[in-house]
A protein has these predicted regions:
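Short, charged, low-hydrophobicity "junction" segments
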Residues: 21-25, 91-102
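Juxtamembrane and targeting peptides
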Residues: 1-57
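Core segments of small alpha/beta cavity-forming domains
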Residues: 39-95
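Solvent-exposed, non-transmembrane alpha-helical starts
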Residues: 131-137
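Surface-exposed, charged secondary-structure patches
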Residues: 95-130
Length: 162
């Protein structure tokens, strides 16, 4: 009888230890996932903010290079549409009318992250001037920004100003 009590006690202690270990492991995994999620959200917010500002910032003398550099942060159909728009509208207009545009991000929020796809909202202040209208015009811009992670980099796959 004594041996069976000892065996029952040992099994009970073992069960408690296993349950405790499982609980600790579960908390550790959840904590690691939360850190990865927070880091991913930070990466998405940074990519959305930096790219949004780059899309809306240029000077007449550097517009082609500025827009090319911004295009390197894009992907998919949006990259092709953006390239065509800048080549046919932004670059010639900036050079002809001496348009300078500077965009500063005022706020960024990540709406969702699902694997390698994310959506963010970016709010910017854009200051634009031309030779014909040298007094700067300030505009508040909000945009929904879709991003896709490719080879570890978050690239903008769509940019919809509102």
């Amino acid at each position: 009888m004594r041996g069976s009590r000892l065996m029952a006690w040992c099994l009970g202690v073992l069960a408690v230890l296993l349950a405790s270990g499982a609980a600790v492991l579960s908390v550790a995994v959840d904590d690691a996932q939360a850190r990865v999620s927070a880091q991913t959200r930070d990466d998405v917010a940074q990519a959305a903010a930096e790219t949004s500002a780059a899309l809306l910032t240029y000077t007449p003398d550097t517009v082609a290079a500025d827009q090319y550099a911004a295009g390197e942060r894009l992907t998919g159909d949006f990259r092709a549409r953006y390239g065509q728009f800048t080549d046919t509208v932004v670059v010639p207009t900036s050079r002809t009318n001496r348009v300078t545009s500077t965009a500063t991000v005022t706020a960024t929020g990540v709406s969702s992250v699902d694997g390698d796809d994310a959506e963010a909202l970016v709010f910017l202040t854009q200051v634009t001037s031309t030779d014909a209208a040298p007094d700067p015009v300030t505009t508040k811009v909000g945009a929904r920004v879709d991003l896709t992670r490719i080879d570890g980099r978050w690239l903008v796959s769509d940019f919809e100003p509102s």
